[in-house]
Amino acid sequence: MKGGKRVQTARPNRINGEIRAQEVRLTGLEGEQLGIVSLREAIEKAEEAGVDLVEISPNAEPPVCRIMDYGKFLYEKSKSSKEQKKKQKVIQVKEIKFRPGTDEGDYQVKLRSLIRFLEDGDKAKITLRFRGREMAHQQIGMEVLNRVKDDLVELAVVEAFPTKIEGRQMIMVLAPKKKQ
């Protein structure tokens, strides 16, 4: 439906005429304390300054109100929450698969990928899969995992190291070391 009336969402803070208290603890534009005043007087001071009276903490006794530009306040609040979201890093678990017979060239390529994952701050899951008769040579698989662990000792901490084989595979999990 085009052109319909929009439902106004409830504001997180009451402003101006929406404030219900008789007296409020007033804070000025610069954050200075102006004391406890009547609601009417507080609204007059806000109108003189050409801004809004915003109820900051309604549960206080008396409620704390501040003289400020409400639009600017909401903008700053949303901007700071976006900044916080941007700073949060979602840690992913990247997986690299090895085989007991992985040759040197392939090993180096996979090792470079592991280094890149760890430097980006992601965890790395190394899966060593056995096929057919390779199951008889599980110690070769352990040697491969130990070699990976030794090659990445500078960058990573082992979170989970396999003590026994699970099905036809061994799994090792590495986490990046915390930067000092």
UniProtKB/Swiss-Prot annotation:
HAMAP family xref list: IF_3 (MF_00080)
Residue numbers marked as site, Important for 30S binding: Y107, K110
Known function: IF-3 binds to the 30S ribosomal subunit and shifts the equilibrium between 70S ribosomes and their 50S and 30S subunits in favor of the free subunits, thus enhancing the availability of 30S subunits on which protein synthesis initiation begins.
Intracellular or extracellular location(s): Cytoplasm
Keyword Cytoplasm listed: yes
Keywords, ordered alphabetically: Cytoplasm, Initiation factor, Protein biosynthesis
Family matches, as SUPFAM superfamilies: Translation initiation factor IF3, C-terminal domain, Translation initiation factor IF3, N-terminal domain
PROSITE patterns hit by this protein: IF3
Gene3D superfamilies: Translation initiation factor 3 (IF-3), C-terminal domain, Translation initiation factor 3 (IF-3), N-terminal domain
Entry GO CC: cytosol; membrane
GO terms, biological process: ribosome disassembly
MF term (GO), any: ribosome binding
Family: Belongs to the IF-3 family.
InterPro entries linked: T_IF-3_C_sf (IPR036788), T_IF-3_N_sf (IPR036787), Translation_initiation_fac3_CS (IPR019813), Translation_initiation_fac_3 (IPR001288), Translation_initiation_fac_3_C (IPR019815), Translation_initiation_fac_3_N (IPR019814)
Subunit structure and binding partners: Monomer.
Pfam family, one: IF3_C
Record-given protein name: Translation initiation factor IF-3
Domain of life according to the entry: Bacteria
